[in-house]
Amino acid sequence: MWIKELELKHYRNYDHLLASFSSGLNVFIGNNAQGKTNFLEAIYFLSLTRSHRTRADKELIHFDHSTVSLTGKIQRISGTVDLEINLSDKGRVTKINALKQAKLSDYIGTMMVVLFAPEDLQLVKGAPSLRRKFIDIDLGQIKPVYLSELSHYNHVLKQRNSYLKSAQQIDAAFLAVLDEQLAGYGARVMEHRIDFINALEKEANTHHQAISNGLESLSLSYQSSVVFDKKTNIYQQFLHQLEKNHQKDFFRKNTSVGPHRDDLAFYINGMNANFASQGQHRSLILSLKMAEVSLMKALTGDNPILLLDDVMSELDNTRQTKLLETVIKENVQTFITTTSLDHLSQLPEGIRIFHVTKGTVQIDSDIH
């Protein structure tokens, strides 16, 4: 898939913008604080209905307006789709082909994106919540039902934690009802995650071995707070651990086990990647991003859109070449932001260049 056209009204520093793109490489050049990242954020937002930079929708609204509108024309294998998101103080409205979508899981996945931004370099050593977010964003696009299961799980988790904080003593019967619901939704969330990580590991290891010239292997490990022996037993064993932890959870006023506490570990040649070099970290993250692209295509039959936000300067020539070779080979529409073309080596033919200045975008040329 690829985005043919994007229109922004009152988004960040863009008062009004209408732009069309190449189905291949699109490079946005400009000084810092001109709107390059805002532009990629808008594409990300149109796909996932959320920003990767802020949780406050009001920050997305142009300073002298009260509403935001984003519309995009997406070319999928199945045909052209029109997406629209409108933000106001009354909330958020999402539409597909002018039809309002009642559920998030009905909208997300229509346009898939993979974002590679500087903050992704913290994925290995950062907080576990970063790695859970990484899993959730990818899985939500590949399997929209996952978002529904995760939403139900978080709703019951909130109920259970609220009860634990307010209760003067344990009502075992009431907790048992919440435990059964939490274990049911949680087990399905974990099953989806396990399948996804197993598939991602295969793709990422293939890319990592290519980048390292066969010198390094990459493996991933899903680390669950729920102790289980096999996937088919997760529900029963999760439920048992919830029941076993009633007193502990009551004392701590929160739920001590479940997918909300799970993590993802990375290993290079069997060694925890927390101890890897900076160069190995960059290769690992690059391998993951390329694996996201190839896995989405393998599981959905369509390519995602790749957003490279100011990361090419973080990669040496070898890693840049591997990345560009992959997107060209897989025919992936790619958006790159940079302050200068000097950071980019071996650019292919057929790219479209845009200049970004103070919330305006001008097409420079198509290079053939």
Swiss-Prot record:
Organism whose genome encodes this protein: Streptococcus pyogenes serotype M6 (strain ATCC BAA-946 / MGAS10394)
Primary gene name: recF
GO cellular component, one term: cytoplasm
UniProt name for this protein: DNA replication and repair protein RecF
Gene3D superfamilies: P-loop containing nucleotide triphosphate hydrolases, RecF/RecN/SMC, N-terminal domain
PANTHER family given in the database record: DNA REPLICATION AND REPAIR PROTEIN RECF
InterPro entries assigned: DNA-binding_RecF, DNA-binding_RecF_CS, P-loop_NTPase, RecF/RecN/SMC_N, RecF_2
Pfam families with a match to the protein in the record: SMC_N
SUPFAM superfamilies reported in the protein's UniProt record: P-loop containing nucleoside triphosphate hydrolases
Stated family: Belongs to the RecF family.
